[in-house]
Amino acid sequence: DANSFCQLPAVVGKCRGYFPRYYYNTEAGKCQQFIYGGCGGNRNNFETVEDCRATCHSH
């Protein structure tokens, strides 16, 4: 599955930045906002909800 990262949990990361981002929540079946610290994390991290939906909509 090319977009298997859509199933990964939201990861804030180790840095202390404040970046509102979106991730695909598999339990809710939709993209939701979380706060990203600015480093680390995984690919389930999108700048816009539109990008999140376009990438992970089929899960």
From Swiss-Prot:
Disulfide bonds join C6-C56, C15-C39, C31-C52. GO terms for cellular component: extracellular space; nematocyst. GO terms for molecular function: potassium channel regulator activity; serine-type endopeptidase inhibitor activity; toxin activity. The keyword Disulfide bond applies. It is found in: Secreted; Nematocyst. Keywords: Disulfide bond, Ion channel impairing toxin, Nematocyst, Potassium channel impairing toxin, Protease inhibitor, Secreted, Serine protease inhibitor, Toxin. Its main location: secreted. Residues 6-56 form the BPTI/Kunitz inhibitor domain. The keyword Secreted applies. Belongs to the venom Kunitz-type family. Sea anemone type 2 potassium channel toxin subfamily. PANTHER family: KUNITZ-TYPE PROTEASE INHIBITOR-RELATED, TISSUE FACTOR PATHWAY INHIBITOR. Dual-function toxin that inhibits both the serine protease trypsin and voltage-gated potassium channels (Kv). This is PI-actitoxin-Aeq3a.
